[in-house]
């Protein structure tokens, strides 16, 4: 078993002026951390796009258990592909980093949703993600122009199309979206990736992945990066560490 010989703080500056830190100590740990809600953290990772620039994945791989990589945004146009998609996924596959995928949704119509699903499928051809393919719901134009029922229908089109092609699927959104727009029980059919940039989620629903901040710093990446915690089965047998959330 390969060990990570590291001790690093992934700092997340919060809007309140404080910071949360995910600490990954050098020693192997017997058990994962348990948060107040009882969830067990079994992996710390990042989500990245072209906005992180060129990533030194050989370095970054030593500090993460997984990655979630943007494939693109909106409808199936090559101009809307993420420019770092190919290199980022190739690096994860070369280094054995478990990864998931997300597509930033702009869908306003059923036709848009079908095109976004086609966009993801085109870019997934030949790729082997171990984690879900997520539809990213954060664009304000969706809430401004679509009813809750329409959003659900668009998400269903995307997710069912990807599932039919053999992929695990999920939905990304922040806590406000989950509690106001995405509160239909149908969403329980898909993996849930929750964004709350704070030391606690304040969310009573279930979720498999928590995006804790967008201001993390990690070796191998020059820009700020989103930090994510995952719950459930361990993703990398060679990464067995205790994860602790603290405030500073």
Show which residues each predicted segment covers.
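Peptidoglycan cell-wall recognition and remodeling modules
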Residues: 74-78, 174-177, 185
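Positively charged n-region of N-terminal signal peptides that target proteins for export
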Residues: 1-5
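Functionally critical loop-and-helix segments that line ligand-binding/catalytic clefts
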Residues: 24-58, 185-248
